[in-house]
C-alpha cells in the first residue's frame, strides 16, 4: 500500500543516490530524537493538498529507501470520489508519462484507471494518492505514498508531523489528534505548512496563527512547533525547480530540521521569527487574490501589477508592525514568497477567475482541482481584527484616531468584494488608482517610525511575542 518497492528507484531518479550523505543526515536526526536501533523515525503528513502531498513525497524520495530507519506516511480523509472528468484527465496524464505507465503496470494498478476512464469504476482520492496522484495536482505525478485514512492510526506514534491542512481545518483536526496524544510521554515535532490566521475578538482582539492553534489543541509546547514557508509552487518543487524556504521557530529544532530537509534543489534556511513568517504567509494569500484580479482586469499590464505590488506590500509591512516591535523585513525569501504567490499561486488564480467571471463567490472557496482558497477566510480575519477601535492608530492627514484597517485601502476593498459582496471585482482598480492616495513609502515610514506595536494582538504581554 505504500511505495517501498519503488523507493530506491525514486531516490536515484531524484538525485539522492549518494546514500552515505542522506543516511548521515537521517542518523543525526534520529540521535537527537533518541531513536533506538530498529525503531524507525516516523514522519506523518496530515492533510493531502498539493503542498502537503509534495512535501511527503520529497521525504519519501529522499529517505524512503532507508526503510529500516524511517517511515513516511500521509493521512487524508476517506471517501472523496474522483469525478468522471478528472478520471479521464488522469488517464491522459498516465499515458503521457512512460515512467508512470510502467510503474502502474508493474504494480498491477493500471487497469483501475482504464475502468475509471470508461466510467466503469469510481476512483477515490486516497487510492490514487497511494499511486502518487494528488487530487489537487493531477498533472504532476508523485512517487507512491503510504496513505492512511484513520487519523488515530496515522498519528499516534508519529515523531514528526507535517501539517498540510488549510488553516481553516487545522484547529478541528489537531483537536482530534490531541485526544490521541493524551498518554504520550514525549511530545512530537510538528512542522506546519499552513498559511492563514484566525481572529478572536473576545475578550480582546487578537490573532491566532496555525502554530498557536496546534499548541492550544494538542498541548504540544510551542518550542516543538515550527513553520516552513518560502517562494514555493508545489508542482515546480517536485519537478526539481530550484527553490528555497525558511523553517521558523525555537532554536531547539529548527537548525537540525533545516539540515534534514535540505536537498540539492530545495535549500532550507532557519530563522527565529516565527510570527512574522506565519502572518506574512496569511497576508500574501489575501493580497494574491487582488493581484489576480488586477492582472485579469488590466490584460496582464506589468505597470498596473507593479503599482498593486508596491501598495499591497506596504500594507503588509504596516500590519506586521502592529504585531511585532521589530518584525523581519519584507526582503529575501519573505519578499520572494509574496512575489511568487501574487504571480502564480492558487489565490491569484482564484482572483483572475473571479474577475473574468469564470468563477463566482457563490461557488465557495473550496475549488475542484485546487483545494481551499485560504486567502478568502484570511481577508475576513484580518479585516475583523484591524477594524477594532481599541487598536486605533493616528491617521497622518486627518490627525485623528482611526482603526488600523483605515490605513489599508486594498484590504478594505477586498473585504467589500469577497466578504460583504458589496462591490464587483473591478472595484479593486479604484483602490489602486485613488488620486488622494499617498506614496506607499509613507505608510512604511509610519509603520517604522511610530509605536504601532500592539502586544495584545498576540495574546501575550510585551516582550514575549517572539517564539
Curated annotation (Swiss-Prot):
Residue sites binding substrate per the record: 195, 346-347
Protein name per its UniProtKB record: Probable glycerol-3-phosphate dehydrogenase [NAD(+)] 2, cytosolic
Species whose genome carries this gene: Oryza sativa subsp. japonica (Rice)
Known EC number: 1.1.1.8
InterPro entries referenced in this protein's UniProt entry, alphabetically: 6-PGluconate_DH-like_C_sf, 6PGD_dom2, G3P_DH_NAD-dep, G3P_DH_NAD-dep_C, G3P_DH_NAD-dep_N, NAD(P)-bd_dom_sf
Role noted for this protein: May be involved in cell redox homeostasis.
Active-site residues, as the UniProt record annotates them: 284 (proton acceptor)
Gene Ontology CC entries for this record: cytosol
Places the protein is found: Cytoplasm, Cytosol
Signal peptide annotation: none
Key words, A-Z: Cytoplasm, NAD, Oxidoreductase
Keyword match NAD: yes
UniProt key word Ribosomal protein: no
GO biological process: carbohydrate metabolic process; glycerol-3-phosphate catabolic process; glycerol-3-phosphate metabolic process
Catalytic activity: sn-glycerol 3-phosphate + NAD(+) = dihydroxyacetone phosphate + NADH + H(+)
Family: Belongs to the NAD-dependent glycerol-3-phosphate dehydrogenase family.
Amino acid at each position: 500500500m505504500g511505495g517501498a518497492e519503488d523507493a530506491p528507484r525514486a531516490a536515484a531518479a531524484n538525485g539522492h543516490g549518494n546514500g552515505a550523505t542522506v543516511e548521515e543526515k537521517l542518523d543525526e536526526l534520529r540521535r537527537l530524537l533518541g531513536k533506538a536501533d530498529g525503531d524507525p523515525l516516523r514522519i506523518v503528513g496530515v492533510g493531502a493538498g498539493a503542498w502537503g502531498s509534495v512535501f511527503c513525497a520529497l521525504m519519501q524520495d529522499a529517505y524512503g529507501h532507508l526503510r529500516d530507519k524511517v517511515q513516511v506516511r500521509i493521512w487524508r480523509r476517506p471517501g472523496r470520489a474522483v469525478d468522471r472528468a478528472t478520471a479521464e484527465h488522469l488517464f491522459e496524464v498516465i499515458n503521457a508519462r512512460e515512467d508512470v505507465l510502467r510503474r502502474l503496470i508493474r504494480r498491477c494498478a493500471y487497469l483501475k484507471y482504464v475502468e475509471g476512464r470508461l466510467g466503469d469504476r469510481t476512483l477515490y482520492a486516497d487510492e490514487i494518492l497511494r499511486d502518487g496522484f494528488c487530487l489537487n495536482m493531477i498533472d504532476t505525478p508523485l512517487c507512491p505514498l503510504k496513505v492512511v485514512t484513520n487519523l488515530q492510526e496515522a498519528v499516534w506514534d508519529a515523531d514528526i508531523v507535517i501539517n498540510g491542512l488549510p488553516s481553516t481545518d487545522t484547529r478541528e483536526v489537531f483537536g482530534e489528534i490531541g485526544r490521541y496524544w493524551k498518554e504520550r510521554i514525549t511530545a512530537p515535532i510538528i512542522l506546519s505548512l499552513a498559511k492563514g490566521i484566525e481572529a478572536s475578538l473576545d475578550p480582546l482582539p487578537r490573532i491566532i496563527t496555525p502554530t498557536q492553534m496546534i499548541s492550544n489543541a494538542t498541548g504540544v509546547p510551542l518550542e516543538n512547533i515550527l513553520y516552513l514557508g518560502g517562494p514555493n509552487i508545489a508542482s515546480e518543487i517536485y519537478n526539481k525547480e530550484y527553490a528555497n524556504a525558511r523553517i521558523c521557530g525555537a532554536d531547539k529544532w529548527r537548525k537540525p530540521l533545516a539540515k534534514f530537509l535540505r536537498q540539492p534543489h530545495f535549500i532550507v534556511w532557519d530563522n527565529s521569527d516565527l510570527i512574522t513568517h506565519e502572518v506574512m504567509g496569511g497576508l500574501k494569500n489575501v493580497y494574491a487574490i487582488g493581484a489576480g484580479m488586477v492582472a485579469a482586469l488590466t490584460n496582464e499590464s506589468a505597470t498596473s501589477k507593479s503599482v498593486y505590488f508596491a501598495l499591497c506590500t506596504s500594507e503588509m509591512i504596516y500590519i506586521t508592525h502592529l504585531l511585532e516591535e521589530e518584525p523581519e523585513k519584507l526582503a529575501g525569501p519573505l519578499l520572494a514568497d509574496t512575489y511568487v504567490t501574487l504571480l502564480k499561486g492558487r489565490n491569484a488564480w482564484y482572483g483572475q477567475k473571479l474577475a473574468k467571471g469564470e468563477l463566482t463567490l457563490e461557488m465557495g472557496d473550496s475549488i475542484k482541482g485546487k483545494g481551499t482558497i485560504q486567502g478568502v477566510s484570511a481577508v475576513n480575519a484580518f479585516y475583523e481584527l484591524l477594524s477594532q477601535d481599541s487598536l486605533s492608530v493616528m491617521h497622518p492627514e486627518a490627525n485623528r484616531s482611526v482603526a488600523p484597517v483605515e490605513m489599508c485601502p486594498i484590504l478594505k476593498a477586498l473585504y467589500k468584494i469577497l466578504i460583504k459582496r458589496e462591490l464587483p471585482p473591478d472595484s479593486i482598480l479604484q483602490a489602486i488608482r485613488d488620486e488622494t492616495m499617498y506614496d506607499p513609502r509613507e505608510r512604511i515610514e509610519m509603520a517604522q517610525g511610530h509605536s504601532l506595536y500592539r502586544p495584545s494582538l498576540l495574546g501575550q504581554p510585551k516582550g514575549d511575542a517572539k517564539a
